Each structure stands twice: as structure tokens, then as C-alpha cells.
Amino acid sequence: MAQNLKDLAGRLPSGPRGMGTALKLLLGAGAVAYGVRESVFTVEGGHRAIFFNRIGGVQQDTILAEGLHFRIPWFQYPIIYDIRARPRKISSPTGSKDLQMVNISLRVLSRPNAQELPSMYQRLGLDYEERVLPSIVNEVLKSVVAKFNASQLITQRAQVSLLIRRELTERAKDFSLILDDVAITELSFSREYTAAVEAKQVAQQEAQRAQFLVEKAKQEQRQKIVQAEGEAEAAKMLGEALSKNPGYIKLRKIRAAQNISKTIATSQNRIYLTADNLVLNLQDESFTRGSDSLIKGKK
């Protein structure tokens, strides 16, 4: 390139006339390069552009998509918008239906409506988020929260969030904004109300505990009554069995001896037992007399 310029300079006539011609050529080339540079611009991905011309203002019918575009230098210049969704956290103190102070924070995912960029620029400019979002969020929050009591804001949080999102989305359309997502990120109350809620929860837990103890005592009382009735019925049945069959006591004694022998057999110690040790003295006269006297007493 430098060699070409030298060759071009060598061909030009020397003297003042030659210098003037060279200067004109350089100025012409510079003007062409500047014109080409100023006539071309690029719209990046996720952006849109509109034209503003110095005679008619914003061109309402021109919205430029991504890519390379041309303009008339000085007469037109592009205004580029980022149309990608951007998150923003907005906090607002407000009051509930029962006059409790509520601090609520929202995460709003918003983007401009690409089809309405010319009118948005005329009304709001490029800093539309700062002009619109805080005001409409505060407006909607105060309107929705005032419909619920403080306790309902906790128990019906999903419904509150849905109502806020619905009303805020409709309100944002008036300003050419699209809300992709609205979510409650924080919900807090005053210290006094929080302390009152905690005290109420403690009282409810104590009441539930007291009720549990009462029910437990009633259950134990019913269990004892059933047990006593069962023992009385068992005693009655035992008396009837003895009166009908005097040998029933001997049978019970044999079963008791069997249980004793099984327990001792599984023990590691070795013990030698007699019939007396196993309560098997069934032929003992004292045992027979005791059984007979018991049967006579039942009669």
C-alpha cells in the first residue's frame, strides 16, 4: 500500500499544482471512507434498532432486526434497544387489610415490546425501566396486598403471587413492557407482629400438648378399665372351670412345670430338679385337700 502511494505521488506533477491535486485526492478518499463508515452500522444479537431523522423525527414504520444496515449520514442515526429479558428486584413497604406493615420484594423479569419501540422511545426514552417499573410495582403491590390480612399473605402466598403477576403484567402493557416472570422473593412483617405470631404459635403448641396429655390419660383409664374387666371375667371363668372339673388346677400346675423346665433347660447352668421342685407333687394329700376345699368354697 505504501509503495502504491509512492508510485502515485511520483506520477503527480511536481510543484504547487501537483501538491494541490494530491491534497484533493487525499481529501476525497478520506471523505469516501468516512461516508462509508458512517453509512453502515450493525445491530447485535438480542437487539433492535429504530431510525431518527432530523426532519421527520422517529420513523414509526421502521424497526431494524439483527445484522448489517445502512443509513444516510448526518440525516439519520439509529437508536438501539436491548430486547432481552433482564431481572430486577424491587422492594416496597405497604399495608395489609388488617393495617399491618408488610415489607415485600419482587423479582421482575422484563423486556420491551419490540413492535412498539418507536412509540416507547417517544414516551419513555432509553431508560424506560427506571421510569416505569418502580412506580407500577409499588402501585400494584399496594393494591393487591390491601386485599389480604397479614396471616393470609403467608397462608395464601401462591394466590397473592398469582394476583400480583396478573395485575402487574396488564399494567406493564400500557408502557410497552412484557413481563416474563414475577415472583415474591421476600415477605416480612414488623417486629411487633412477628413477636405476636410467635407467641400465638407457642400458645397453640402448648394447647395441643395439653390436649394430647388429656387424651393420653383418658386412653390409659379406658385401658385399665378394660384390663380390670378382663381379669374379672377370667376369674369368673376360672371359678366355673374349677366347679365343673376339679382336675383343672392340676392341669394348670403341669403347664406351669413345663414352662419352668423349658426355661431351666435353655439356661447355661446345670440344675437337677425333683418333682417337688417342678411343682409336680400331684399325689400329695395336702394338694388334694387344698383343691377339694377350694371347690367346696366355690359351691
From Swiss-Prot:
Post-translational modification: Phosphorylated. Tyrosine phosphorylation is indirectly stimulated by IGFBP6.
Necessary for transcriptional repression as annotated region, ranges: 19-49, 150-174
Chain positions found as N-acetylalanine: A2
Domain statement: LC3-interaction region (LIR) is required for interaction with MAP1LC3B/LC3-II and for Parkin-mediated mitophagy.
Phylogenetic placement of the source organism: Eukaryota, Metazoa, Chordata, Craniata, Vertebrata
Gene name, Swiss-Prot/TrEMBL: Phb2
TM spans (from-to): none
Assembly: The mitochondrial prohibitin complex consists of two subunits (PHB1 and PHB2), assembled into a membrane-associated ring-shaped supercomplex of approximately 1 mDa. Interacts with ESR1, HDAC1 and HDAC5. Interacts with ZNF703. Interacts with STOML2. Interacts with ARFGEF3. Interacts with SPHK2. Interacts with COX4I1; the interaction associates PHB2 with COX. Interacts with MAP1LC3B (membrane-bound form LC3-II); the interaction is direct and upon mitochondrial depolarization and proteasome-dependent outer membrane rupture. Interacts with IGFBP6 (via C-terminal domain). Interacts with CLPB.
CDD domains: SPFH_prohibitin (cd03401)
Coiled coil (residue ranges): 190-238
Originating species: Rattus norvegicus
Gene Ontology BP annotations: antiviral innate immune response; B cell activation; cell migration; cellular response to hypoxia; cellular response to retinoic acid; estrogen receptor signaling pathway; mammary gland alveolus development; mammary gland branching involved in thelarche
Protein name: Prohibitin-2
Pfam family for this entry, one: Band_7
